[in-house]
């Protein structure tokens, strides 16, 4: 018997609890929830949320961050849809509903490859240019992905978490024992530690994800988001990622940084240092009164 696939509509309704925190016009309901799709590639069953807009001149690939998933961002995607834009939001494994086949290793390179493949697939459908929009660490994923795809015509990021900068690694970790000693151990003993799984709450300052304690608690307890246990291989490869194209040499497309003003997890100065090095057309907008998620 064929295995039935999980669904946010029928089997995993936790996301419905988030809706009360959003303005009524972008809340998800029976007639406004994203279309759910599945795609099997690279040893991954990839879950994708789609908010269609047939007349949209572009497609927006919305990339979640650590401790998130595509459905968590869907009210923001709904806002974009209401303005005429089609949005595609994949769940990057092991977050959300996506899952890997036996023997598939979950690491940062896999995430980038999946995103590039989604871009190629979407472009082949109708030739519409792609804009990548990344939230939290998804901002840097948007940058890495755009550096590999000629179809990306714009990058929008809420932060640039460049983990090649040791000060950035110290900033996002709960303490320097994790950011320095922990990283050193993962680098020395990948064969022993790569398959160990921990919650992102244990290796980051996830308690700073929003400026609303109730919403933060909801995200922290979400079994498809911050409560998901990730393999240390994903963390190790994320922390060791160097930009394949340095920002001074990046020529792919314009960049828009929309940075939360009240973001204690990744203060603006860290994103600004990367943003200032970009040689392309760029703009920075500060989201007044906002934290990293809301």
Language-model features: locations:
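Short alpha-helix in the alpha/beta-hydrolase fold that links the catalytic acid
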Residues: 253, 267-276
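Catalytic histidine-centered segment of alpha/beta-hydrolase-like enzymes
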Residues: 290-294
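Catalytic nucleophile-loop/oxyanion-hole region of alpha/beta-hydrolase
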Residues: 67-69, 96-127
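An N-terminal hydrophobic leader/cap segment in hydrolases
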Residues: 1-40, 44-51
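Active-site glycine-rich loops that stabilize anionic/oxyanionic intermediates
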Residues: 65-68, 136, 261
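Short beta-strand/loop motif that positions the catalytic acidic residue
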Residues: 251, 257-259, 263
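Alpha/beta-hydrolase-fold enzymes
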Residues: 137-230
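Conserved alpha/beta-hydrolase
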Residues: 70, 77-100
């Amino acid at each position: 018997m064929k295995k039935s696939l999980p669904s946010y509509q029928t089997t995993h309704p936790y996301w419905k609890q988030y809706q009360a925190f959003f303005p009524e016009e972008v809340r998800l309901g029976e007639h406004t929830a994203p279309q759910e799709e599945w795609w099997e590639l690279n040893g991954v069953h990839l879950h994708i949320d789609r908010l269609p807009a047939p007349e949209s001149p572009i497609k927006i690939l919305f990339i979640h961050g650590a401790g998130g998933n595509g459905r968590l961002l869907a009210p923001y995607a709904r806002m974009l849809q209401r303005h005429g834009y089609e949005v595609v939001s994949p769940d990057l494994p092991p977050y959300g509903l996506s899952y890997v086949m036996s023997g598939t290793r979950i690491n940062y390179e896999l995430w980038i490859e999946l995103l590039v493949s989604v871009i190629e697939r979407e472009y082949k459908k109708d030739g519409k240019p792609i804009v990548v929009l990344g939230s939290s660490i998804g901002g840097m994923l948007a940058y890495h992905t755009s550096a590999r795809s000629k179809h990306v015509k714009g990058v929008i990021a809420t932060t640039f978490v460049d983990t090649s900068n040791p000060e950035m690694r110290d900033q996002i970790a709960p303490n320097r024992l994790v950011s320095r000693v922990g990283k050193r151990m993962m680098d020395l003993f990948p064969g022993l530690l790569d398959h160990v799984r921990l919650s992102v709450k244990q290796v980051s300052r996830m308690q700073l994800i929003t400026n609303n304690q109730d919403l933060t608690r909801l995200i922290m307890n979400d079994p498809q988001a911050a409560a998901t246990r990730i393999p240390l291989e994903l963390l190790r490869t994320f922390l060791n990622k160097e930009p394949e194209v340095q920002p001074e040499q990046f020529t792919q497309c314009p960049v828009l940084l929309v940075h939360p003003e009240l973001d204690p997890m990744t203060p603006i100065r860290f994103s600004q240092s990367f943003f200032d090095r970009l040689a392309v057309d760029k703009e920075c907008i500060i989201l007044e009164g906002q934290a990293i998620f809301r």
